């Protein structure tokens, strides 16, 4: 055991916050690092840490003529993604974790992990990262402190969060903060040679909702180690939102302005592989319309003094899936990356010191793949891991809305829920009211691929696209959504309208009916015109869909039959959906709000009343 007084840097804290100082000393005593460094967020610190990571072989400096001030990382092949089976919600009461989360009693988990943490930072530096999710100028800034032994995490957190000395100053001596503890779990004996990506076979990502703590061990991958992201901003924040009357959601936020200059804000929840980042950075194909980005992944929504729901993006960077991001699908993301200051992980490296991944056009004749091996277009495997990532400052996005910086957030006019369904779900459906919208979100689904499941087209529920991220019982989460619909003054007209979209419907030959990408602006146009009371809709058993000719398809290479099928509500397909929803709802027992059962019964009755 190393007494904390002997750990270099332990007594050089740039703060007098007593609870923070006590916690740092406690963790230093437990983990026994060689030294403690308080991350200040400066350019000099970025240079020092990236230089050290390059020297250690963890990072490769990219060609500055291609990607200025940018780096490439290659992880251990076993440490490439979030590990949901090792992710726990350690609520005091097991029932509060619910059927969608892994649970362990908090005392048992802390005993287990305390032994893993004991001496786990030996031979390494312990970094203390003060950070804030969302603007520091907010009425109630959302502070966090991450303790980590990974310099890769320090560099990435500088991109993804507002962090450093300015956060410590804003915290003063008494601000509350989320305690976020992370270790890669790879202590070094004296003289032991380090590896380029240290990690541990044993992994835990544990959340303690009542005490607002996160303990992560064994993984250096971003989703498991950048604890401000999913761990704080969704799992812990969703519990805070439940307790305090707001929502923490897995949603993009965009601003759309019509040719007449009227601006609206839309939030959208989409499961993975459904184009959330692409929609957030949309380039409209219809003349006169403009889209700006507020956020691509997380939205915190609170009621404003006017009774409307306002959203902020708590993140400072983009942590996007690389494959499939290209000039055709998301030119604004590519422009953001071209401005440099980024970290790329598990993509491929070109011979001239740039990065490449599948989807970026013709592959070069030679690459070094994500495992460090030679790769050519004749290779039988992909050059980049399917979950390879870019980490880049959102402030470099060329269409970032000025509203992004507003600590009060932006007023949300519409909420989208979207999944990947080859049939059944129309291109766009408008909910009848807020509770019907919650039903649509609670039953949100996507189809798995053959690679993921061994069977194409298996429908999996992903409520509000939050399945891996709800920090408490999902039945209570649905109830919280319903309660939020009562607003602050009972005026439902101030609530966002809710829509369910599906860009992925296919025809009988298996081809996508809708072109997607920039053409999705046509669906957003119809939604805006619905908000303004100008677009026609048709009543169906599942909600309102665009009337014939209400959707602007001018210039699209689509037949009227294609459009009809894309918007079709097939009674037989929807009746086949009912037992799947029933099975899903039964998971939650008496925690499921009765109004959602009532919505299902009403849908069944409307379908039964339709002519076959």
Swiss-Prot record:
Positions annotated to bind GTP: 273-278, 389, 420, 517-520
Cofactor note: Binds 1 Mn(2+) ion per subunit.
Keyword terms: Cytoplasm, Decarboxylase, Gluconeogenesis, GTP-binding, Lyase, Manganese, Metal-binding, Nucleotide-binding
Record keyword Nucleotide-binding present: yes
Named cofactor requirement(s): Mn(2+)
Signal peptide boundaries: none
Amino-acid positions noted as binding substrate in the UniProt annotation, renumbered to this chain: 82, 221-223, 272, 387-389
Keyword Metal-binding found: yes
Known pathway: Carbohydrate biosynthesis; gluconeogenesis
SUPFAM superfamilies assigned to the protein according to its UniProt record, in alphabetical order: PEP carboxykinase N-terminal domain (SSF68923), PEP carboxykinase-like (SSF53795)
Record GO biological process: cellular response to glucose stimulus; gluconeogenesis; glycerol biosynthetic process from pyruvate; oxaloacetate metabolic process; propionate catabolic process; response to lipid; response to starvation
PANTHER family (UniProt xref): PHOSPHOENOLPYRUVATE CARBOXYKINASE, PHOSPHOENOLPYRUVATE CARBOXYKINASE [GTP]-RELATED
Protein function: Catalyzes the conversion of oxaloacetate (OAA) to phosphoenolpyruvate (PEP), the rate-limiting step in the metabolic pathway that produces glucose from lactate and other precursors derived from the citric acid cycle.
Subunit structure: Monomer.
Name the UniProt record assigns to this protein: Phosphoenolpyruvate carboxykinase [GTP]
Gene expressing this chain: pckG
